[in-house]
């Protein structure tokens, strides 16, 4: 049986593990520092916005999660004060080296030192944002949809009127999933760009439809 439940503090190591195993570009084999991906895409949500984190757990342990922030601008500001400074002391900014030579680790470290904020027109319409990851054993069984439903309802209860996310343009299965959950495509990069595809959902419309 798979249980969808709220995050607990002792789940943090599992968030790091799942985040690494599901990372684009090779997952666990792509990074020398196994904590880096989680430092950017998982742990800050568990620490700074734990009410916005839910997990899927089966007899083997945690197999997936959804996490995010109800107010993206507030979260970005908190990262700059409460999260990035500590990591910047640990990881050296690679900006003074040739970008073409950067490793997967250095690409993430650069993001720690130079985070880019979400475009204002997206945040104004869809203030919340999310990340969702499932290990293969839980995919295709409806648990991603259950996590999404739980998270979106929680965001609405917290006062949000919309949520957004970004996904790689070549990740067709994820794009199909988000569309099935009610997200609408906001912006698609040119075919030669490495930029992500942005999706958004108006929460009042979605809840009314379900």
Model regions and ranges:
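Conserved catalytic-core motifs of GNAT/GCN5-like acyltransferases
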Residues: 73, 164-167, 179-199
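Glycine-rich acetyl-CoA-binding "A-motif" of GNAT/NAT acetyltransferases
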Residues: 61-64, 173
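Helix-loop element at the rim of GNAT/NAT acetyltransferase active sites that forms part
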Residues: 17-32, 44-45, 160
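Conserved acetyl-CoA-binding loop-helix of GNAT-fold acetyltransferases
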Residues: 131-134, 140-157, 176-180
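A short beta-loop-alpha structural element at the N-terminal edge
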Residues: 3-17
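Conserved GNAT acetyl-CoA-binding A-motif
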Residues: 126-128, 155-168
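Active-site rim helix/loop that mediates acceptor-substrate recognition in acyltransferases
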Residues: 31-53, 59, 67, 115
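Conserved acyl-donor/pantetheine-binding loop and adjacent beta-alpha core of acyl/acetyltransferases
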Residues: 73-131
């Amino acid at each position: 049986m798979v249980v969808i439940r709220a995050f607990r503090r002792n789940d943090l190591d599992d968030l790091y593990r799942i985040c690494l195993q599901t990372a684009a570009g090779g997952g666990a084999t792509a990074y020398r520092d196994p904590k880096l991906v989680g430092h950017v895409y998982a742990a800050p949500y568990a620490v700074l916005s734990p009410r916005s984190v839910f997990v899927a757990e089966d007899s083997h342990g945690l197999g997936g999660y959804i996490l995010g922030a109800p107010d993206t601008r507030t979260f970005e500001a908190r990262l700059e004060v409460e999260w990035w400074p500590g990591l910047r002391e640990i990881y050296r900014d690679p900006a003074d080296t040739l970008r073409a030579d950067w490793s997967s680790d250095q690409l993430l470290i650069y993001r720690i030192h130079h985070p880019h904020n979400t475009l204002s027109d997206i945040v104004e319409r869809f203030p919340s944002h999310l990340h969702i990851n499932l290990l293969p054993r839980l995919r295709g069984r409806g648990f991603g949809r259950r996590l999404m439903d739980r998270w979106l309802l929680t965001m609405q209860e917290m006062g949000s009127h919309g949520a957004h996310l970004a996904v790689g343009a070549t990740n067709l299965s994820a794009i199909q999933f988000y569309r099935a959950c009610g997200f609408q495509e906001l912006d698609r990069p040119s075919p030669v760009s490495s930029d992500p595809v942005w999706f958004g959902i108006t929460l009042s419309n979605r809840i009314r439809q379900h």
